[in-house]
Amino acid sequence: MNKILLFLFLSFSAFAQNRFEKEILAYEKQDSIAMPAKGMKLFIGSSSFRLWKNFDADTKGMNAFNRGFGGSTLKEALYYFDRMVASYQPSWVFMYEGDNDLTSGTSPEEIASQFEEFSARLAKQVPGAKLVFVYARPSLDRAANKAKQQDLNQRITAIAAKKKGHFVIDMHSPFYNPDGTLMQDIFVADRLHLNEKGYVIFAKQIQNFIRQHAQ
């Protein structure tokens, strides 16, 4: 009985610590059938990547693949680094993390520190790979986080400016009207995630970057 209880406890603990394990396993199963080639552009991050329905069409000819998972955080991207980054040996890594982190109470300073850890691991395990941080974007649901998002984006920009092969993409300012108000018609019903119109803007920012820097 004690062994059974211990097994159940360990199983529950592992599940609790790895809330997106099922998604990661699904990607690994997909990879076992068709593994992405080395040297591609990897997109890893939270639901802004995961819910990008037109990703394949929007990145056609750009040698890219998407491994967005859950509503992940940068800490979770670090946790799955070996399986979801190093295993692919990409030439570019596009990251969208930070937004959920701020909402869960992680400070911009701590997220920036985690970004530097991610950068260091990338340099060690995938030598020569370039790293692109996609700015935390605004939303109606998280309007109160605007200042923290801007703080985080500025911190990452400062880090990237000092590191070779590091870049940022402004995914914050494009969602505002000329009068400074946040666009109202680019979100789905939850007022957080982007709708089709929102993803047109989202995709354009990334497409423009790739054409200018990563072709």
Where are these regions (language model features)?
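Catalytic His-Asp segment of secreted/periplasmic serine-dependent ester chemistry enzymes
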Residues: 140-215
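Charged helix-capping and loop-helix junction motifs
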Residues: 108-118, 148-153
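N-terminal secretory targeting modules
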Residues: 1-42, 49, 53, 57-60, ...
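Conserved beta-strand elements of the Class I
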Residues: 42-44, 65
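Oxyanion-hole/transition-state-stabilizing segment in secreted/luminal serine hydrolases
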Residues: 49-63, 76-112, 132, 136-140
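Acidic-and-aromatic substrate-binding clefts and catalytic sites of carbohydrate-active enzymes
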Residues: 71-75
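Extracellular/periplasmic catalytic domains that process cell-envelope and extracellular macromolecules
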Residues: 34-37, 58-59, 86-87, 125, ...
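A short helix->loop->beta-strand "cap" motif at the edges of active sites that frequently abuts
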Residues: 126-130
